[in-house]
C-alpha cells in the first residue's frame, strides 16, 4: 500500500509558492498531511490564498478544519521525516524572501482585477492618517486657539444679553400696558368714546398703501435673480453683442476679461521683451543642447502600455499598485519609470494631478527590492517644499510599499525631534523630508548620516530652486555624495540651465509631458472682473460666490496669512464652516485643518500658497482665487488642486485692474490649449449687500481678534511657567545637552524668508521709499539722456559767472548800507 500512497502525494520538487489550479482537488483527494501543512502556512502568509480559501465551498472548509485538528492531535508522527525537513526548508526560504511568494511560473500573469482588488482602496487620496494623529499628539505642541470656540462663546454671551434685554422690555411693556389700561378706565368713566381700529382690516386690497410689502419682496427677488452667472464661452459671447443694454454690459464684461485687450504699456514692453527673449532663447537652446542628454525615441505610441505589468516590475510592487487602484500608468509614469530604473538623472514635468509622485516612487521601490539587506542603510532622500506635501508623499509611498520590506521615515517640522532621531537610528531605506528639518538632523543627530545616499528626489523642484530655498538646498547638495541619481519633478519646471547646474545633474534626461504650462482639460476657468474703484468690495464678491454659487468642497487662496485669518473669522460669524491653512499655524493645527476639509466637516479651506503645490485632496470641486497670484506659474499650481486624475473641476478668479497681466497670460494659455474659459457676472448691488454685512461685523471681528490674542498670550505664559518648572527639576540634564547648530545666522534666515516672500507675492509695499527732489532730478536727467533729448548744458564759465555777480552785488549792497548809516548819524 505504500506505493499507492506515494502516487497520490504531490512531489515536493514540483511545489512552488504560486497559485495552483488544482489546489482544491489536492485537498479533496486527501493529500499528504505534511504537504497540506505547507499549503496552510503559505495560505496564512499570503492574502490572496486567504481570499481563495475563503471563497471555497463550506464543505471543503470543514474538511480543512478536520485536517488541521488531526494534525494538531497527531503532530509530526504521521508525516515523514523527509517531509518535515522539506517544510522547514520552505519556511526558511519564505522567511528570507519576506512577503514575496518565491519564484514565479514562466506563464504566470498577475491578475490586477478579481481577487487582487479585493482590498482595493477606493478613491485613494494620500491623506489617510496611519500614525499622523498619534505623532501629532506626542509632539508636545501647545494647545491651539480655536476660533470657533471664541465665536460660539461670544454668541452665547450675546444671546444671554439679548434674553435679559427682552425680559426687561417685556416687563416695561407690561408696566406701560397696565398704566394704559388704568388711563383707559379713567377715560371711559368720564364718558369719552373709544376708537376702534379693527375696521382697518376691511380695507380693499387695492387701496392706497396696500401691497407695499409684496412689491419690496418682488424687487428683492428680481435683484437676487439678476445676480446670476454668465458662463458662456468666448465664442458665444461675441454673438450676443446685439440686444438690450443689459446684454451689452454683460458682453462687455465678458470681452474685457476673457478677451484680453492690449494695453499700450504692455505692447511696448512686449516688443522690447520679444527681441531680448529671442537672443536669450538662442543662448539657452545651445546650453540645453549641451546640458541635457538626448531623449530616447521609442517606436511605441504613448498609449501602447496599458498596464504596469509591461514594465517588468516585481510582484510586490504590482500588488501595492493594485491595492491603491493604480492600473494604467499615466503619460509621465510611462516615460519616467523605464528611465529611472536605468539609474539616469531626470528632469520631469507634467500637469498637476498626473501622478508624478508615483512616477518616482515606483522605480525607487523596484530598485530597493534588490538592495543588500545585511546592513541597514539609508539610500534615498525625497525633499519637499512644504510639510503637508511631505506627509502626503509619505502616505502614498507607504501604501505602495505595503507588500515589501522597504522602511520609510518622514522628517517634517512640527513633530518631535526625539522620535525622529529614534527612527533614524534604525537607518530607514527612504527619508521623506523638508529641507529645514533634514539639515537640522544632518548637523545635530549623531545617528544620521548622508554618506550612503544613492538617490535624491526634488519634488516641486522649481520652488526648491527659488531664492527662498537656495541656501538650504546648497547646504544639502554640498554634503551628500556627488555620485548619485538625481530626479527633479514639477508641473512648471524651470528651463534655466544655470539653476539646474546647481543641483549637480549629470547629463539628465528631460521628460516633458504637456510642457507648455497647460491646465487640465477637465478644468473650467472663470473670471469675475472688479471695476476700478470697487476693489474694496472684493470680500463681498467672495461671500456671494461662497454662499450662493460654490457651496461645498472649495479651496480659497489668499496672498497673505493675515487676510486669510480675517476672512476665516468672517466666515465663522456668518455661519459658513471653514478651516484655514497657512504658515502661522502649528503643525497639529495644519494637519487638523486638512483632515477636517478632507472628511467634509468644513466646506471651505482658506489657504495661502502653502497649499498651492502638490496637495492632493479627493473631491475638491472648486478653487477660488481671492486675488490673482503674482505669476502665471503660481496660478497653474493653485487651479491644479481641482480637476485632478481625470475628474472635472472649476476655478474662479476675482480679478481687478492690477491683476490684468496674470489674467491675460492665463486666458492666452487657455485659448491656445483649447480649455474652457468663461466670464461670471455678479451684480454690484448683491456684492454691496454682502460688503455691508461685513462692515456691520467690523466691531465683532476686532473683538474676536483681541480675545484670540489674549488667549495666545495666556498660552505663552503657561508655556514659560512650564519651561521654568522643567529647568528647576531637570536643569542639569537640560544644560548638559549639546546646543543645536545651524548653518545660517538669524540675519541670513530673515533675508532668505524675505526673498521667498518676494518670489510669491512680489516686492513689499513697505520697501517703497519716497524719492527726494535730488533723486527725482537725477532720474529725469537719465531719462532725457536715454531718450536723446539732451539739451544745452552750462559750461565752466557760465557756472562761475553767477557766483562772481553775487559777490559783486554783495559788496555794492554793503557799501550802500554803510553810506545810509553814516547819513543817519549826521
UniProtKB/Swiss-Prot annotation:
Associates with pre-ribosomal particles. InterPro entries: DEAD/DEAH_box_helicase_dom, DEAD_box_RNA_helicase, Helicase_ATP-bd, Helicase_C-like, P-loop_NTPase, RNA-helicase_DEAD-box_CS, RNA_helicase_DEAD_Q_motif. Residues 128-138 have a biased composition (Polar residues). It catalyses: ATP + H2O = ADP + phosphate + H(+). Residues 538-690 form the Helicase C-terminal domain. This is ATP-dependent RNA helicase drs1. Residues 11-42, 82-110, 177-203, 213-252, 267-284 have a biased composition (Acidic residues). The keyword Hydrolase applies. A motif (Q motif) lies at residues 306-334. It holds the Pfam family Helicase_C. The gene is drs1.
